[in-house]
């Protein structure tokens, strides 16, 4: 029997294969993701010209970029700037990092992409160990006469091991 559009349960819904997760880093914001050993991470620069700053913490909460084979470039000034804003989402993110006992003050970061990056360009990374990663899409407020908004990044995580545990079946709040 041929598949037809009648078989589509939710039109427009992008269905990912098992073990693949999609995260969006909003322009000017950040996203934290728990990464496990041998997970593959693809960072996609959707619209181009967007810098991506990455900070990685090992299972002990210490900054360790080598887990993703990244080199230290700066002491994560852009991530710190985003976290030190006094808006509600920044305060929530800072609280979550403190709950995880991650020392953001002493953390280092690496910069992926630059202002010359083409739209759709991506980079793939592979985790060597369990870690918590913070991905940021930093940028200044848009100047009307320059048309320079920060844009979103897409993070695709392909899990090395697909878990069917109860904690992964519950939708978070």
What are these regions (language model features)?
Residues 1-173:
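Acidic, Ser/Thr/Pro
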